[in-house]
C-alpha cells in the first residue's frame, strides 16, 4: 500500500507503516512516498 507520507529513506516509513499494519509491517521508500506491506 502506498501511503501519503513523504520519505527519503525507508526508516521514515517505519512508524506510519507500523501504525497501519502493526509490528510486523514492512516498509519501502518508492518515488518519495512510503510503501507499506504486511510481512
Curated annotation (Swiss-Prot):
Residues flagged as site, Basic residue of the functional dyad: 28
Signal sequence residues: none
Pfam short name (any one): Toxin_2
Compartments reported by the entry: Secreted
Tissue distribution of the protein: Expressed by the venom gland.
Keywords: Disulfide bond, Ion channel impairing toxin, Neurotoxin, Potassium channel impairing toxin, Secreted, Toxin, Voltage-gated potassium channel impairing toxin
Disulphide bridges: 7-29, 13-34, 17-36
Alphabetized GO MF terms: ion channel inhibitor activity; potassium channel regulator activity; toxin activity
Main localization, broad class: secreted
Site (Aromatic residue of the functional dyad): 37
GO cellular component, one term: extracellular region
Presence of the UniProt keyword Nucleus in the record: no
Family annotation (InterPro entries): Scorpion_toxin-like_sf, Scorpion_toxinS_K_inh
Function per UniProt: Inhibits human voltage-gated potassium (Kv) channels Kv1.1/KCNA1, Kv1.2/KCNA2 and Kv1.3/KCNA3.
Family, per entry: Belongs to the short scorpion toxin superfamily. Potassium channel inhibitor family. Alpha-KTx 02 subfamily.
Domain notes: Has the structural arrangement of an alpha-helix connected to a beta-sheet by disulfide bonds (CSalpha/beta).
Protein name as it appears in the record: Potassium channel toxin alpha-KTx 2.22
Organism of this sequence: Centruroides bonito
